[in-house]
Amino acid sequence: MSIIAKTVFIGLSGGVDSAVSALLLKKQYQEVIGVFMECWDETLNNDFYGHKKINNNKSGCSSFQDFQQAKKIANSLGIKLIKKNLIEAYWNKVFLPMIQSFKKGLTPNPDIWCNRFIKFGLLHDFCKQINPNSLFATGHYAKINMIENQPLLSIPKDTNKDQTYFLANVKKEQFQNVIFPLADLKKITVRNIARENNWEVADKKDSTGICFIGERHFSDFLKNYLPVKKGLIKDWKTKQTISEHDGVWFYTIGQRSGLNLGGLKQRHFVVAKDIETNELFVSCDKEELLKTTILLDQFNWLYTPKQLPSQVLVRIRHAQKPEIAKLKLLSDNKLEITFKNPVISVASGQFGVLYTLDQICLGAGLI
């Protein structure tokens, strides 16, 4: 990415990755401006159940602490920090659709929608309104390769921290004027840079909760928004009732914890859900979780090669090793994926992300 632009906006989250990104940008650009997104309000959003911790400021939600950390980072770098309230937009564009998906028996991924509609959508647009000629940066572990003036999303140097799975549903035009400062850095290097600058965030653990909401006991958290609806748990093969559950929307394919099946000798997994009858089906046979073919709908093309490759790499979840598969185009935005080796725990509502063999992201589709 050219550094002709004088101004770059960086999404400052209060974590180590965005902090080090801001530091690196400060060395390249005349003006760096931090932007912090406020996307969640516990009281306004009736967020009472499922908190993992309680502190003096915000119980369970890290938004308050994250903003304080972002301010410290901005002050230490001598850069301006803007706080942007996107609570209503996040609720309408990310959170409510997530709840509706759960009601349909799906397993949605709110982080993917957040990147498309909020971070690289509304926040990016907000920054362009302030300065139309500016660049936009985040602390994602991802890479942009410019080919024929087109930004192509690619796997970064630190493949263990690769976050392209969460970015693959962003529209390709949204990556114009976007840079990822950590593209060629390992996480250990990022933490060491933070330690050299005596930043508290140097050893801050990576966030694993819902995007901008924080750590939660997930099924309890969902009970803020979805009713308990008792139903039967049945054996997949015999169809015999073996227990009961609180509602099929609280469970996902492959889940083995929280099933209350302590009396059974073998470990069981969720293999199917019937949203109409509110029945949950489990099995102790992992073979029931394997699939060789999946369909991807609403496919978002980030890169359309002149000829579709005979083989692609596919992820059906973050941090999964990409699997070799064959690709069949059913329509412009519907694909059939056939894996070389069976994959486990495919959940409808998640995303399948495709890559070329040389690690360029083709895009993402809904499973």
UniProtKB/Swiss-Prot annotation:
Catalyzes the 2-thiolation of uridine at the wobble position (U34) of tRNA, leading to the formation of s(2)U34. Its main location: cytoplasm. Residues 109-111 are annotated as: Interaction with target base in tRNA. Keywords: ATP-binding, Cytoplasm, Disulfide bond, Nucleotide-binding, RNA-binding, Transferase, tRNA processing, tRNA-binding. This is tRNA-specific 2-thiouridylase MnmA. Transmembrane segments: none annotated. It is an enzyme of class 2 (transferase). ATP binds at G11, L12, S13, G14, G15, V16, D17, S18, M37, G139. The record marks H140, Q350 as: Interaction with tRNA. The keyword Oxidoreductase does not apply. It is found in: Cytoplasm. It comes from Mycoplasma genitalium (strain ATCC 33530 / DSM 19775 / NCTC 10195 / G37) (Mycoplasmoides genitalium). GO terms for cellular component: cytoplasm.
